[in-house]
Amino acid sequence: PSYRPGRDASAHLPIFHKDINLVKQEIPDFMQDPLGMKELCGWIMRRIVRTSLELIGEDARVFTRDLYPCYEHFARYYPARAAEMYRALELAVFPTSDAKVISDLLNDLGIWLCSEIARKYPDVVVRS
């Protein structure tokens, strides 16, 4: 096919940092709502895992929305971050209401992913 995975399949790259910041701001609002916190956790962790594939999709020449293949492809390109991404995958499937667990992953893997996106694709990152 003439379709080539890459930036044209990268819906989340330009706004990913905004998603991370939004969730970090919303966590205190969900402290007394465990179900809401789990929904928030599941949403942002799915976003992290899928965005990780967008980061390497052009190089890997792959695209999928399935979470485990997103993780597998990312782990091949960034083995040093594979364990953290696997944790994000686990939380995408089995979300937690533990704000500290969510915040810790956002502050480490989420911020690193934002930096890596900005480094690799400075022309597509939308700054707030």
Question: What would you call each of these model-derived segments?
Answer:
Residues 5-128:
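Conserved nucleotidyltransferase catalytic core and NTase-mimicking acidic/glycine-rich helix/loop elements
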